Amino acid sequence: MVTTPNRSLLAAIKPYFEAGPLGALALGMASGTPYAMIAATLTTRLAESGIEKKSVTAFGLALLVYSFKPLWAPLIDRVRIPVLANLIGQRRAWLVVSIIMASAAITWLGLLDPTADLALFAAAAVAVGFAGATLDIVIDAIRIEWLRVDQMGAGSGMTQYGWRMGSYLAGAGALLLAAGGSWALAYASAVLLFAPSLIAAAVLGEPQRPPALQSGKGLSAAIKDSIIAPLADFLTRKGAWIVLAFVLVHKIGDTVCQLSVRLFYNDLGFTKEEVAFYDVSLGLFGYLAGVFLGGLIYKRVGLAGSVFLSLILMGVSNAAYAGLAIIGHDVWALALVQGFENLASGIGGVTVGAWLALLCDRRFTATQFALLSSAAAILGRAFSSGTAGALIESLGYVDFYWLTTVLALPGVLIFLWLWRAGLVVADDTVETATGA
């Protein structure tokens, strides 16, 4: 009997080390890299260059490109890249091409000086955003198609682990290399983080897809199958519009908060080395702990309860930044705030991410997941890019971060309504996914 707890622990962690979830880990690393280079890392670089707050937060528009993924996701579901697709398969061919695009764009951005030509620098940032968004479409499709239904929770967790590892290594590595005086080297080195995803794709092979999606058809049929059918499939389900409303609003507060954080740290006087260690490094451990806890909570509490808990935690974590604004420059306070924020984000990434994956019909994986994941961030990115800088200047950081906490409430309330209405079932099924 004394071995029961050990067996329970082994049973809990075993799914994370199966082939599909391990592949998701490698894919997540690739996904997090471009995002890191145009999010917090770019904000630090611009703030350090003396660019005014309004212009710095406006660069969040480069991230807004991610929100338009559904516009070209159908192409990735349907279009075969000549020669390469015949050699390694459609999904893996797109993976190789999108990684080449992202590597070139990241390297270009690192070579430019924002003080010399801000417009060209912005164009390069948008190019990284487009390449990263394309890579995300491919990665999400491969990940979901690699995983069995019973692996979705572990697979979502490992994706979050990988994403945070990629963004951590890219972000912290960039800060440390830049501290030595070379942003170009910092950006060029980040492309090495794409290698694990290519290795995973080589080992696990081309994911299996429904035969109906692999056959060639005429243009009108292709448009219907790749654009109209995925949207109609999702939007005609019971409660789909309410689910979409939740997806649109639940991350507004968190997105607005996070896109201003590096600017906030710069104004508080934290050095690049302090941010790299206390924010990025210690934050990573908080996030990894959150991902692990998220997987356990998902398994023990069920889908609905775990998502609701994570929404509460993510909202409360925004208020912690208001506390840091009051305290000021204090590395221990920074470590505490980042630890809690990343813990909450890790839990939320697993639970909400698993729900979004379960909502996807495998016939339209790339298109539907691109729609859901981009909708989850579009309002927050648009709001923060257009008004965050002005709000910080007019409200100050304390009131600004209280505002981001309030912005998290609509998502909590909508999800609570969905849960009570029976549109989210706690036994790892989602009623809207079946149309029941």
Model-derived regions, located:
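Glycine-rich segments within core transmembrane alpha-helices of 12-TM secondary carriers
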Residues: 66-69, 153-178, 375-385
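C-terminal ends and interior cores of transmembrane alpha-helices
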Residues: 93-115, 312-329
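Juxtamembrane intracellular "pre-TM" segments in multi-pass secondary transporters
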Residues: 3-17, 209-242
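Symmetry-related core transmembrane helices of the 12-TM Major Facilitator Superfamily/SLC fold
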Residues: 97-103, 185-203, 401-417
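Helix-to-loop junctions at the C-terminal end of transmembrane segments
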Residues: 69-87, 289-306, 392-393
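C-terminal transmembrane helical hairpin of 12-TM major facilitator-type secondary transporters
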Residues: 305-352
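Transmembrane alpha-helices of Major Facilitator/SLC transporters
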Residues: 65-72, 278-300, 310, 314-317
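Helix-loop boundary and gating motifs at the non-cytosolic
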Residues: 6-66, 241-246, 250-264, 268-271, ...
